[in-house]
UniProtKB/Swiss-Prot annotation:
Record-stated family: Belongs to the glyceraldehyde-3-phosphate dehydrogenase family. Epd subfamily.
Organism: Aliivibrio fischeri (strain MJ11) (Vibrio fischeri)
HAMAP family: E4P_dehydrog
Single GO MF descriptor: erythrose-4-phosphate dehydrogenase activity
Domain of life: Bacteria
Annotated positions binding substrate: 158-160, 204, 217-218, 240
Name of the featured protein: D-erythrose-4-phosphate dehydrogenase
């Protein structure tokens, strides 16, 4: 049994814990503690009731020291609650923690990971892109087989790299990609304003519900980290839109082989059934963003929107639940790190 602690119980931290109980991994992973500066009452309430993903299937109660999760067999799981801002003071050694899932979105350097290690944890997995000095960055389904036992401090990438990189790999393996551009159409996030207010990024001073808002992205750097051969071959832009969840990614690539739409779509179908099973899905149904809410895949390719120009320029629409899909990949990578 892998003993895990979650550092940061926000959108991703809560989704990871919920996903554990909605998956087949609960008999392999035990969450022994959650470190969060908020009060236990708020932690339990937001875990039980979620505006995006609905009510949690199990009853959740709490006291000042534990979250309690009732199970169908009448037993109860308990998760220790911690409120420690200093990573070096966390009691990972006494709790015998094997792996930290750091879901704060704040920490991501090797030095941050070492603080968890020095506090007694064996390994650390960050929920967002980390520094180049980390032991590895994993996009599960693409390069998780590069994990080594000595890799102690690892990044799980981002929701967008987890979405687009498996699709890029499938197309590149089949046809060879020369270059590409990506537009991320991302739901609003909690670093935006409810109404106009001050922010260091002037575009983010504007109300999230009122505008489509361009934001900076380093997605192309994330692609280069996994595929060095694509250095300076991809560029990306990102906009935030007034929806609560689910992201669409507009991928355009120039490829070395003359193809038709069906060639591209069939490649994704084949990958979804084989090498990228449970990672990438495929649909041609007339769906909209909300239909992909709570979808555990990293990416869902909408084949009805695939276009090919002049045999070599390919455009694809790829969906993902930027919270739920990523949370499920955190669990997959956690198990891969335990081997």
């Amino acid at each position: 049994m892998l003993r895990v602690a979650i550092n940061g119980f926000g959108r991703i931290g809560r989704s990871v814990l919920r996903a554990l109980y909605e998956s087949d991994k609960r008999d392999k992973i035990e969450v022994v503690a959650v470190n969060e500066l908020s009060q236990p009452e708020a932690m339990a309430h937001l875990f039980q009731y979620d505006s995006t993903h609905g009510r949690f299937q199990h009853k959740v109660t709490h006291d000042q020291e534990y979250l309690y999760i009732d199970l169908p067999n009448g037993s109860q799981d308990k998760v220790r609650i911690l409120h420690q801002a200093d990573l070096s003071l966390l009691p990972w050694q006494s709790l015998e923690v094997d792996l930290i899932l750091d879901c704060t979105g704040v920490y991501g350097s090797k030095a941050d990971g070492e603080k968890h290690i020095n506090a007694g944890a064996k390994k650390v997995l960050f929920s967002h892109p980390g520094g180049s000095d980390l032991d590895n960055t994993i996009i599960y389904g693409v390069n998780h087989d590069t994990l080594l036992p000595e890799h102690r401090i690892v990044s799980n990438g981002s929701c967008t790299t987890n979405c687009i990189i498996p699709v890029i790999k499938a197309i590149d393996d089949a046809f060879g990609i020369d270059s590409g551009t990506i537009t991320t159409i991302h739901s609003s996030m909690n670093d935006q304003q409810v109404i106009d207010a001050y922010h260091s990024d002037l575009r983010r001073t504007r109300a999230a519900s009122q505008s489509i808002i361009p934001v900076d992205t380093k997605l192309h750097k994330g692609i280069e980290r996994i595929f060095p051969k694509f250095s300076n071959k991809f560029e990306a832009i990102s906009v935030r839109v007034p929806t609560v969840n689910v992201t669409a990614m507009d991928l355009s690539v120039t490829i070395n082989t003359n193809v038709k739409v069906n060639d591209i779509n069939q490649t994704i179908v084949n990958a979804s059934r084989c090498t990228l099973h449970n990672i990438v899905d495929y649909t041609e149904a007339p769906l909209v963003s909300i239909d992909f809410n709570h979808d555990p895949h990293s990416a869902i390719v909408d084949g009805s929107q695939t276009r090919v120009s002049n045999g070599h320029l390919v455009k694809m629409l790829v969906w993902c639940d930027n919270e739920w899909g990523f949370a499920n990949r955190m669990l997959d990578t956690a198990l891969a790190m335990s081997k």
